[in-house]
């Protein structure tokens, strides 16, 4: 019998498993899916150190291309590119980048700790270290629509549209929805000043091959209000006094746990966690590599907002927001806004592509739960579950639906493992 059974749907489950094993727990990993070699998101240094790994972290450069606008890791190159559209915006870009970087650093520190509570004094002290102006910036920025934030700073439509599109990626909200400025900050955490696209790393490849059991979990066994292990679809039982689930809270608590073990009010709240699919992901295999690494088609904030208007009524936008990242001749395309099951249009992207050899499409919410401000920090995914522990004895959650959420690779698993060790 193991001390811990980890249902590993991704990176976070493996991170939790290895940290618990390093502390002497007997861990069995049930690996439901193969890990991708390339993982998108910032790998916090405490996570890499705890795992004893040295992942290779890369940012595309330029990290954003929107028509003739290119934004680079080199601040001055970005300034010169912006100057072609607006000398005023070019002058403001370094100040904007530094202001956002200061706020992003605060989030980066918060993300490798349990979610802060409203009465958490250490959180209050970290915020106070920003100084009066920094505190005002943070409190004003987090609940803002990203369109208002960008309108405050810039005038060029192409710059505002591209940044706004990144802020609402995979979110069923538009750029004029409250709290979307938080998303721009979230994906800036851990990045160099002036870079608002998550990095990619090879941490998935480094963690490969460490799984013990491959198979699909059919149910989590519960006896007298406490977990006793998991049962696979094959009928095999994997016993353990603690179960850590890297799959979504909805699947964990509503599908894998038998009805009756969860309070009806909490079950209802779990069923209402927003995890709507609003983007279609298309993997294109091209005859040759395109002449760009990233490409964003979002010419203005109004364009992004109109695309969102379509999905509100369950229509796929005919002029969607498109974000593409090329890795040689393989291109990952996100087409937003497309309701789950809708058919995306790639017509706008076609002029920028060499001939397509093959394409594969995936729908759905890739992050288990939408990363909106009301489903973040101490409310992610629900206040009752924000500490990774469930009401069922020995059952913990560590997936991307948990704090801090998508874009911070391994942090949910890291925080969950530390919470288990403290329990």
Question: Each predicted region: which residue ranges?
Answer:
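Extreme N-terminal leader/targeting segments of oxidoreductases
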Residues: 1-4, 22-24, 376-378, 383, ...
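N-terminal glycine-rich phosphate/pyrophosphate-binding loop and immediately adjacent elements
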Residues: 2-112
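A conserved FAD-binding loop/helix module that cradles the flavin
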Residues: 40, 400-422
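Helix-rich C-terminal "cap"/substrate-channel and partner-interaction subdomain
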Residues: 95-122, 318-379
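Active-site/ligand-binding neighborhood in enzyme catalytic cores
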Residues: 101-214, 366-369, 373-376
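Mid-domain catalytic core of redox enzymes
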Residues: 193-197, 216-328
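Hydrophobic, well-ordered secondary-structure elements that form the walls
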Residues: 244, 284, 333, 349, ...
């Amino acid at each position: 019998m193991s001390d811990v059974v980890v249902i590993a749907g991704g990176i976070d489950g493996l991170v939790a498993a290895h940290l618990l094993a390093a502390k002497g727990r007997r861990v069995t990993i049930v690996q439901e899916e193969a890990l991708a070699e390339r993982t998108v998101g910032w790998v916090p240094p405490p996570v890499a150190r705890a795992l004893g790994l040295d992942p290779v972290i890369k940012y595309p450069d330029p990290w954003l291309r929107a028509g003739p606008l290119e934004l680079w890791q080199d601040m001055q190159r970005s300034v010169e590119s912006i100057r072609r559209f607006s000398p005023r915006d070019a002058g403001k870009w370094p100040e904007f980048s530094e202001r956002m970087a200061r706020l992003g650093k605060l989030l980066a520190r918060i993300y490798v700790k349990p979610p802060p509570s409203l009465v958490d004094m250490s959180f209050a002290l970290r915020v106070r270290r920003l100084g009066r102006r920094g505190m005002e910036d943070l409190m004003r920025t987090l609940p803002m629509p990203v369109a208002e934030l960008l309108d405050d700073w810039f005038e060029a439509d192409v710059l505002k549209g591209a940044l706004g599109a990144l802020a609402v990626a995979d979110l069923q909200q538009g750029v004029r929805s409250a709290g979307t400025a938080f998303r721009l900050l979230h994906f800036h955490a851990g990045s160099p000043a002036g870079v608002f696209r998550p990095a990619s790393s090879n941490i998935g490849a480094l963690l490969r091959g460490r799984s013990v059991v491959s198979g699909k979990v059919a149910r989590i066994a519960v006896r007298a209000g406490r977990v006793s292990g998991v049962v696979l679809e094959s009928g095999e039982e994997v016993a353990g006094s603690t179960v850590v689930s890297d799959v979504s809270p909805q699947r964990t608590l509503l599908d894998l746990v038998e009805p009756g073990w969860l309070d009806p009010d909490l079950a209802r709240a779990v069923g209402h966690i927003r995890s709507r699919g609003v983007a279609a992901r298309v993997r294109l295999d091209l005859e040759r590599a395109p002449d760009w690494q990233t490409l964003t088609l979002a010419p203005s904030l109004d364009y992004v907002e109109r695309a969102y208007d379509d999905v509100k009524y369950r229509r796929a936008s005919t002029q969607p927001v498109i974000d593409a990242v090329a890795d040689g001749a393989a291109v990952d395309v996100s087409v937003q806004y497309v309701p789950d099951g809708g058919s995306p249009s790639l017509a706008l992207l076609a002029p920028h592509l060499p001939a397509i050899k093959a394409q594969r499409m995936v729908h759905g919410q890739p992050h288990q739960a939408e990363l909106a401000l009301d489903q973040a920090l101490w409310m992610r995914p629900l206040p009752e579950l924000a500490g990774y522990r469930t009401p069922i004895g020995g059952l913990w959650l560590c997936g991307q639906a948990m704090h801090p959420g998508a874009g911070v690779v391994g942090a949910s698993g890291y925080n969950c493992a530390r919470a288990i060790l403290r329990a």
